[in-house]
């Protein structure tokens, strides 16, 4: 049971502690979702009263996968994938692998091994290329505008920092373009960068000739 003195102190305005209502308001502010960061088209069409899943479904941003149509859309639900017949599985055997066919009791009845792996690999590459070339029409206006933004986006040019450039100049002055020896230098390569990482850093800085100036 609460002490009457403590109860009166909490109700009094002389106390420095926040009241129960003030605490409740603070917790409500903390529970509020953060502002959406992204393209303006998403910010305009985003409904704050809906969940993320509901917004994605309304904007046409959900992938084409089987989704449960029940009242609840919680993440704990698991979607049962459609069963693939054995004949279809047999056609999709990966190169270098075989497939074991079992009956209902679990006994092995057949083992499928592709004899012509090279031909299957070439056919699979052709199918994949055809799938990549097939354009998918956007279903909503939001998706169309997002695709236009993605098509017009330019790559961000990265620049080396002054300290990174100074360090690379020391390596180039000592080893020239021999990145293998740069990676092995324990004194200069204090960050233990690999040969590939050093190559990418030199390329980002403008190349060996730019670092020699």
From Swiss-Prot:
Taxonomic classification: Eukaryota, Fungi, Dikarya, Basidiomycota, Agaricomycotina
Key words, A-Z: Nucleus, Ribonucleoprotein, Ribosome biogenesis, rRNA processing
Feature: compositional bias, Basic residues: 1-14, 22-34
One annotated GO biological process: ribosomal large subunit biogenesis
Chief location: nucleus
The protein's name: Nucleolar protein 16
The keyword tRNA-binding appears for this protein: no
Assembly notes: Component of the pre-66S ribosomal particle.
Family recorded in the similarity comment: Belongs to the NOP16 family.
Protein localization: Nucleus, Nucleolus
Record function comment: Involved in the biogenesis of the 60S ribosomal subunit.
InterPro entries, per database record: Ribosome_biogenesis_Nop16
Keyword set includes Transport: no
Chain positions covered by the region annotation Disordered: 1-42
Top-level taxon in the UniProt lineage: Eukaryota
GO cellular component, one term: ribonucleoprotein complex
Stored Pfam families: Nop16 (PF09420)
């Amino acid at each position: 049971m609460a002490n009457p003195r403590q109860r009166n102190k909490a109700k009094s305005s002389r106390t420095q502690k926040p009241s129960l209502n003030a605490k409740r308001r603070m917790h409500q502010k903390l529970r509020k979702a953060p502002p959406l960061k992204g393209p303006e088209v998403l910010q305009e069409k985003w409904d704050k009263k809906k969940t993320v899943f509901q917004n994605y479904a309304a904007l046409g941003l959900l992938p084409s996968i089987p989704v449960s149509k029940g009242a609840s859309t919680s993440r704990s639900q698991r979607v049962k994938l459609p069963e693939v017949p054995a004949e279809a599985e047999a056609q999709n055997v990966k190169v270098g692998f075989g497939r074991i066919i079992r009956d209902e009791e679990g006994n092995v009845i057949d083992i499928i091994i592709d004899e012509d792996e090279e031909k299957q690999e070439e056919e699979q590459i052709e199918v994949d290329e055809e799938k990549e070339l097939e354009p998918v029409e956007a279903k909503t206006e939001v998706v169309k505008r997002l695709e236009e933004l993605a098509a017009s986006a330019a790559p961000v040019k990265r620049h080396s920092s002054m300290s990174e450039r100074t360090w690379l100049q020391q390596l180039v002055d000592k080893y020239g373009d021999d990145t293998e020896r740069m990676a092995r230098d324990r004194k200069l390569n204090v960050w233990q960068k690999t040969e590939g990482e050093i190559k990418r850093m030199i390329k980002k800085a403008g190349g060996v000739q730019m670092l020699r100036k």
